[in-house]
A protein has these predicted regions:
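Extracellular low-complexity, Gly/Ser/Thr-rich intrinsically disordered linkers
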Residues: 142-198
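Extended, compositionally biased alpha-helical segments that mediate assembly or anchoring
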Residues: 138-139, 201-204
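Surface cap/lid and interfacial helix-loop subdomains adjacent to catalytic sites
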Residues: 4-159, 164-166
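Catalytic nucleophile loop
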Residues: 1
Length: 206
């Protein structure tokens, strides 16, 4: 849609950003523009507009395998982008995750997570887990991915790991990473970024 209906047209200046969670967006190696989107660069700062943000999430302790589907492309002259909505300029940053409080989050299970050790009832539709996750874009095993660190504290009553892996019984599909919660991990960061981009867009008199 961006390449065919937006780039090179007046509507391109009206786009704050395209947030393409869990998607391989290709650029020439070492560049922030080209290949998939010829005129739409990667967002590298919060006040940038008419740009693209894309990421694929993996546990820091379980990076993408060499045969993984995310974070890489077959052509060695190209690579996928990684832009963390919580820190577009790079580096490790706390991400502000928001999860649905009901039904299975991502492990393809039917039961809801136990958000607290005493399984206290949750009455809100979403759950925040402040400080539980931090993430940064890294290159590992030839893949550019969002590496997710879990800051679990076994001593506190809160859930230590929400899940998000693709599982088939006991088997974990490592090449999928945390694809099922790509959006949830940075949900509030995406929401918070929009008014910043909107203010920048208005300031330019678009």
């Amino acid at each position: 849609l961006i390449a065919e209906e937006i780039e090179g047209k007046p509507t391109a200046t009206q786009m704050l950003s395209a947030m393409l969670a869990g998607t391989n967006v290709t650029v020439p190696k070492g560049k922030d523009q080209g290949a998939d989107f010829k005129q739409t660069p990667v967002c590298r700062k919060a006040g940038q507009t008419s740009c693209v943000i894309a990421w694929t999430s993996f546990r820091e302790t379980s990076p993408p395998p060499a045969n993984g589907r995310y974070g890489r492309v077959p052509d060695p002259a190209h690579e996928t982008i990684c832009a963390n909505p919580a820190a577009l300029g790079g580096g490790m940053a706390t991400v502000n995750a928001r999860f649905p409080s009901g039904a299975g989050i991502g492990d393809l299970v039917a039961d809801s997570p136990r958000w607290t050790k005493d399984n206290a009832p949750i009455t809100t539709p979403t759950v925040a887990v402040p400080g539980l996750y931090a993430a940064q874009c890294v290159t590992v095993n030839g893949a550019n991915v969002l590496s997710v660190r879990i800051n679990a504290d076994p001593a506190d009553p809160r859930i230590d790991d929400v899940g998000g892996d693709v599982r088939f019984g006991a088997f974990v599909a490592q090449d999928w990473g945390l694809h099922l919660i790509d959006v949830s991990l940075v949900m509030q960061d995406m929401v918070d970024l929009v008014p910043v981009q909107l203010a920048a867009w208005k300031a330019r008199g678009r």
